[in-house]
């Protein structure tokens, strides 16, 4: 008998690091965690710091921190000053020159939050890919999460890149986002944009489908002799179905005349509708970045201008948009010193 004695192959530092990152622990780290955790920590830390202490007086002429009297709904990390252009505003860059106070004043926290937030979201998406691969799942969770990433990147990065500066991006705050929505409406007529319409249909349609699906499953749960309670009559290892797809199919067939007969197609549809809505709306935002126009019904505008008695909901909205522009241009860009005489301000035909 021959016995072969060999040395165990030495493992390099990469293999050791790979094992440590993928170790089973309470909070999985993984290779994606190298990107996710530092970026998420820094983005959230910058946002909390900005909303607590940093003023927007030097960038927007506004108070935007708890220290100045704002609350959770009105505090924000504001976008940089228009004069900063598309500079990344590094702390050590020519704008701040290593001065942290000056860096905060010119809007450095916004670029810091936006860029680290973007990479943090991408890291979270990669985390779902990585864990799905390790446990043998399909990557549809990560594919679905690409929708929110597309919206975030298009709104906070691509839109201002198409405009004059980061100044035109939304600031990170609740009321600040509302102001940005009014800006999109006034300057781009966003609500009449077909990509916005498809996005709304996708998001609200997804919410409707989610509600219908959850209610239908609850309605068709099988009763369990031991525990008929909705939340306890199920174990992950049970072999039988927990609800009746046949009953659900018959119910909706009677309601609408049609119903999903295939669970796979049903759940793919639940995935497809909202994710497509998110992607389409992000494409629309990229169009706005390039100043592409929405629907224009010029014939109605011309007729309304010539005939005082003719007005449509469209022409009224156009007048509202003009009012938003006239107000925002002066208020939101004080450095431009816009002055609008009374005769150019919009008025409806009824006035």
From Swiss-Prot:
The keyword Iron applies. It comes from the Eukaryota. It is found in: Plastid, Chloroplast thylakoid membrane. It holds the Pfam family Photo_RC. GO terms for cellular component: chloroplast thylakoid membrane; photosystem II. The keyword Protein biosynthesis does not apply. A plastoquinone binds at residues 213, 260. Pheophytin a binds at residues 128, 141. Fe cation binds at residues 213, 267. Its EC number is 1.10.3.9. The D1/D2 heterodimer binds P680, chlorophylls that are the primary electron donor of PSII, and subsequent electron acceptors. It shares a non-heme iron and each subunit binds pheophytin, quinone, additional chlorophylls, carotenoids and lipids. There is also a Cl(-1) ion associated with D1 and D2, which is required for oxygen evolution. The PSII complex binds additional chlorophylls, carotenoids and specific lipids. Its main location: plastid. The chain crosses the membrane at residues 39-59, 123-139, 151-164, 206-226, 277-293. It is an enzyme of class 1 (oxidoreductase). Chlorophyll a ChlzD2 binds at residue 116. 2 of the reaction center chlorophylls (ChlD1 and ChlD2) are entirely coordinated by water. Photosystem II (PSII) is a light-driven water:plastoquinone oxidoreductase that uses light energy to abstract electrons from H(2)O, generating O(2) and a proton gradient subsequently used for ATP formation. It consists of a core antenna complex that captures photons, and an electron transfer chain that converts photonic excitation into a charge separation. The D1/D2 (PsbA/PsbD) reaction center heterodimer binds P680, the primary electron donor of PSII as well as several subsequent electron acceptors. D2 is needed for assembly of a stable PSII complex. This is Photosystem II D2 protein. The lineage of its organism: Eukaryota, Rhodophyta, Bangiophyceae, Cyanidiales, Cyanidiaceae. The gene is psbD.
